Structures are given as C-alpha cells and as structure tokens.
C-alpha cells in the first residue's frame, strides 16, 4: 500500500501502513495502522480528530448522498467537505444533517442539503462516537442528537465512525460516562426510575440531562434525555437495547449496534482504521 503524506502546521507525516487481522468475537476485524509523527509540535486531541475526520472524508465520491454527523469530531468532517466543495475537488454531492447544529454548519459552508423523505438511501455517513467496543458496536448521542443520527446512519450503505482513542472500551458502558436515552417529556421521571431499575445489576444511576441553566435539556425533537451511568459494562448490548425498547415513552437509545462498517481511531501514536 502506498505511503500517505499530510503537510500541515503540525508537520504530520503518515508512513506506510501495516495491516493485521484481529479476532473480535464472531468475526475478524481488519486493522490498518497509520504511524503519525509530530516533527516540531505536540499533537492536540483536536489535531488528531481532524486528521481522522479528513481521512474519513477521502471515502466521499462525486454523486454521493451523505449523512452528516453531529459533534466535535464530525464537525471537522463537515468542514473538510465544505472546503473540498469550495475548491472544486468535490462536487455533485448532497448531505442529510443529523441535527439543527450540523444543518447550520453545513449551510454556512454551502453544502447542499436534502432529507430522508426525498433521499431514503444514503451512500455514506460519517459521525463520531462516545464509546467503541472491539466489535465496533457503539454508544453515541452524548451530543443530544441520537434519534436523528440513528435514523440517518441506519440507512447508510457505509457508516464510517471517527473517534479518538479515549473512546475505546472493552464493553459498552465501560467508560463510566453517560449512555443517553431519549424520552418523551410526559412522565419522564417514571421512565428514569424504570431504566435505573432495569440496569441495577450494573450499578446504574440515571439522571435527567439539564442545560447550563439547570433546566431540562430539550432535543431537536422536543424530547428529554435520561443519561445512564454504569459502574460495570453491559454484558449484552443487544439484550439491553431490546429491553430499553419495551418501555413506552422511550423514543430512542444510544446503543448503535452492528451499524458501523469502519472506525477510524486517532491516538497519540497514530491513526488506525478498523473494519469488520
């Protein structure tokens, strides 16, 4: 495989990647590692996120319908798409945003936007993740856009996830950070209690998400979010998703299972592309 070089203010150099197969449960995962060397300055987390996001954007071809993710890492990808459109290097694409925030960003960059009603099939979606396990299953939605993210990414032919290495976990829920569940406002506390009880064996604590003013956080869909915090990882993400879905008033959850086709992880030692 040919060497790839990136020249930027960080003076990054990508050297020839090595390829290895790793066993991850029932199916092997292909891992392609790109060595990254900082020649003059230390790489920040944002530098690495940007590098990984730009790597994901390389998969975009003219004529594609794109799913545009939400969050700090996805924003770098949207920025890069806008730059390529402006320079003429990319053309004849349309995007479907996963949040009002992403919609505003895309419009400001001149990215043509459409919706699922007119474009129900998506060629490629690019988004970030909050947790990534060895099987490329995900926790997403800490940015509050989980419902629209899942609607868009579930119908994508390819779904590339971009994240930094702090998002890697051995089991979903293992980071100790929030796993979001979007619920209707009506009797939200009823579902908060039920969700905490459902996962009591994992030491779950459920909290209503609030904004900077201490008021309930309201999603783009006018719903609330209940954040679940686990002391131990979930044993079976698919079983957990099924049980959450049984609760009336639950709109969506942040378990994105069997959806990612590849994950690009940026870390202090380089960028790794993992595929199923």
Swiss-Prot record:
Keyword Acetylation carried by entry: yes
Disulfide links within the chain: none
GO term, biological process aspect, one: pentose-phosphate shunt, non-oxidative branch
Catalytic activity: aldehydo-D-ribose 5-phosphate = D-ribulose 5-phosphate
Protein's cellular compartments: Plastid, Chloroplast
Enzyme Commission numbers on file: 5.3.1.6
Pathway stated in the Swiss-Prot or TrEMBL entry: Carbohydrate degradation; pentose phosphate pathway; D-ribose 5-phosphate from D-ribulose 5-phosphate (non-oxidative stage): step 1/1
Transit peptide as recorded in UniProt: 1-39
Main location: plastid
Modifications the protein undergoes after translation, according to the UniProt entry: Phosphorylated by SRK2C.
A GO-annotated cellular component: cytosol
Modified residues (N-acetylserine): 40
InterPro entries in the cross-refs: NagB/RpiA_transferase-like (IPR037171), Ribose-5P_isomerase (IPR050262), Ribose5P_isomerase_typA_subgr (IPR020672), Ribose5P_isomerase_type_A (IPR004788)
Protein's UniProt keywords contain Protein transport: no
Any one GO molecular-function label of the UniProt entry: ribose-5-phosphate isomerase activity
Positions of post-translational Phosphoserine modification: 108
UniProt similarity note: Belongs to the ribose 5-phosphate isomerase family.
Summary of the function given for this chain in its UniProt record: Catalyzes the reversible conversion of ribose-5-phosphate to ribulose 5-phosphate.
Record HAMAP family: Rib_5P_isom_A
UniProt name for this protein: Probable ribose-5-phosphate isomerase 3, chloroplastic
């Amino acid at each position: 495989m040919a060497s790839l070089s990136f020249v930027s203010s960080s003076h990054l150099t990508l050297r020839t990647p090595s390829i290895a197969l790793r066993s991850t449960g029932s199916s092997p995962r292909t891992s392609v590692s790109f060595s990254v060397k900082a020649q003059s300055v230390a790489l920040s987390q944002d530098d690495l996120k940007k590098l990984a996001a730009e790597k994901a954007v390389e998969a975009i071809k003219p004529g594609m319908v794109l799913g545009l993710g939400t969050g700090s890492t996805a924003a770098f990808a949207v920025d890069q798409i806008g730059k390529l459109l402006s320079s003429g290097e990319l053309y004849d694409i349309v995007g479907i945003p996963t949040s009002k925030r992403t919609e505003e960003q895309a419009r400001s960059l001149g990215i043509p936007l459409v919706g699922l009603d007119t474009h129900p099939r998506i060629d490629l979606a690019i988004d970030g993740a909050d947790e990534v396990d060895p099987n490329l299953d995900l926790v997403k939605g800490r940015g509050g856009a989980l419902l629209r993210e899942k609607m868009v990414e579930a119908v994508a032919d390819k779904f590339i996830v971009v994240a930094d290495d702090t998002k890697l976990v051995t089991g979903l829920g293992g980071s100790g950070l929030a796993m979001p569940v979007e619920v209707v406002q009506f009797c939200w506390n009823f579902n908060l209690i039920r969700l905490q009880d459902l996962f009591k064996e994992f030491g779950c604590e459920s909290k209503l998400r609030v904004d900077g003013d201490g008021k309930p956080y309201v999603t783009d869909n006018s719903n609330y979010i209940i954040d679940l915090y686990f002391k131990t990882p979930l044993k079976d993400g698919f079983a957990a998703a099924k049980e959450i879905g049984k609760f009336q008033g639950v709109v969506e959850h942040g378990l994105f299972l069997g959806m990612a086709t590849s994950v690009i992880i940026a870390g202090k030692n380089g960028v790794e592309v993992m595929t199923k």
